[in-house]
Structure formats: C-alpha cells, structure tokens
C-alpha cells in the first residue's frame, strides 16, 4: 500500500480571513504531497507567499512557507492509495508543474462556491478543487460533491489518518 498526503492549512492573512469567514471553516488551504515531510508538495495558491494577489499552480517550498507564515497551523492527512495511483498522481503533478504558467487560481470560482454553483474554466482551480480533480481521476474520492465545490472542510476525515502540527514540516 502506498500513501499520499494532504496538508490542510490555517493560513493567516487578510484574503484567508475572508475565505475563512464566508466559508465558515478553520482550514482554508490544501496542499497535495507525495511524502509525509511535504518535500514534494503542490497546490494552487500564492506564487510568492508574500504577495496574495498573484496565484496559480506552484510547488510549495516548506522553508519559504514557514518563514512567511510562522504561526500557521497544519493538519497533515495520510491517504492510502495503490502504487499505480500514486505514480499517476506524481505524473499529473509534474506535468502540471511544467505548465504552471498556463494554470491560474480560479478567483471567480470562489464566488461560484459561495453560491453553491459548479464552476470550471480550463486550467483554473482553487486549491481544493484541484486536489479533488486529481484524486478523483484516480478513483480516490474525498467528497461526493463536484470537484469545483470541494472545500478543505468538505474533505472527509473519516478515511484519512491525521495529526495536527503548528509548524510546517
């Protein structure tokens, strides 16, 4: 049995506080990682941790994130998968990373999410909609909702083993 890891993050900051307020949840950001230390982790979010308005698909660098958000809280979840599923996810992450400047954060998707409306434009995602789509393509469903409606709160913890940490690993 292989594993992938999902980090749910309580990101500080003005934009995150708006999302937290309107969605009513503690964790407002998700990261998909191939290892427990999050050394190979990807997400849709800030291209630079200090500039919230420029966002897209990025590899998350733990030292840079920890420096920008030293008070952030994390919930690291382990998800069982097959070796074939993990390899397919790895290939998708690497392919998308090569094309990262053609992939954008779906800011309009946040508005649709607030209205409970499905939303998709090619290569535009929120962090949690990307996670749901990538996993769903491999038959790993973290929510019964359409991928564009998945939020960090919608991730079902019942099949995830998790621990909380106050520091980015």
Regions found by a protein language model. Give the residues of each.
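Conserved small/polar residues in nucleotide/adenosyl-binding loops
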Residues: 158-165
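Beta-rich nucleic-acid/ligand-interaction surfaces
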Residues: 150-156
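Active-site nucleophile-His-acid catalytic modules used for acyl/amide transfer and hydrolysis
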Residues: 15-22, 70-148
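Glycine-rich catalytic cores of cysteine/serine-nucleophile enzymes that process amide/ester linkages
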Residues: 9-77, 111-118
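Extreme N-terminal starter segment of soluble prokaryotic enzymes
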Residues: 2-4
């Amino acid at each position: 049995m292989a594993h992938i890891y999902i980090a749910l993050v309580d990101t500080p900051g003005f934009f995150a506080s708006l999302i937290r307020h309107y969605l009513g949840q503690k964790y407002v950001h998700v990261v998909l990682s191939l290892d427990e230390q999050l050394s190979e982790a990807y997400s849709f979010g800030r291209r630079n941790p200090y500039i919230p308005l420029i966002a897209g698909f990025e590899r998350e660098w733990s030292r840079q994130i920890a420096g920008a958000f030293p008070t952030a809280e994390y919930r690291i979840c382990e998800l069982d998968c097959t070796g074939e599923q993990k390899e397919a996810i790895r290939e998708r992450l690497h392919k998308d990373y090569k094309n990262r400047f053609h992939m954008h954060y779906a800011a309009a998707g946040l508005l649709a999410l607030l209205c409970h409306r499905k939303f998709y434009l090619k290569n535009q995602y929120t962090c949690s909609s990307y996670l749901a789509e990538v996993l769903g393509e491999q038959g790993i469903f973290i929510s019964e909702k359409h991928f564009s409606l998945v939020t960090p709160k919608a991730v079902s913890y019942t099949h995830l083993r998790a621990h909380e940490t106050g520091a980015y690993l």
